[in-house]
Amino acid sequence: VQEQIRITDKKTPVGVFEEAVKTANDSIRQCASETPEFAGMGTTMVAATVLDDVAYVVNIGDSRLYRMSEDLRQITVDHSLVEEMVQSGEIRKDEMRTHPNKNIITRALGTDETVRPDCFEIQVRQGDVLLLCSDGLTNMLEDSEMEEILRENKNDLEQAGRTLVERANEAGGKDNISVILVRL
């Protein structure tokens, strides 16, 4: 993203995100084409930048952004088969985390020549906390568990991050776990 801010003529946050996603997608695809053991690799992503009272968000795949204000709210929508099943009414939202197809994503960086990220903006307030995380966290903990951990550690985000990872690992920790917490 920082590279794109320097070189792009698209100076809006959304324009910068779109260019950064395109560049990352091209780089991953090139690496996969040059190194046989990387063939077919891809990744998910979520990123945000805040200007004044607006958070600009981009996501691809099932990495998520949450906002903790009065309560914890999922902001991004997963690009996954189970999310599509929820939207069509085939399963309930509370069944996503344990569904056998929970790891099938419908969009990722590096898997297709072009990628369509979701780019949007949300209003934020001073004191809000943003949680950016991978599915290694959200597949192991319910949103209510994450909210409880954030409330218990509201004055120590570093400890909150450690506790989120520890609890996800204790719950089975089947995937890598990435957590970023930012207080506005």
Report each predicted region and the residues it spans.
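PP2C/PPM-type serine/threonine phosphatase catalytic domain
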Residues: V1-L184
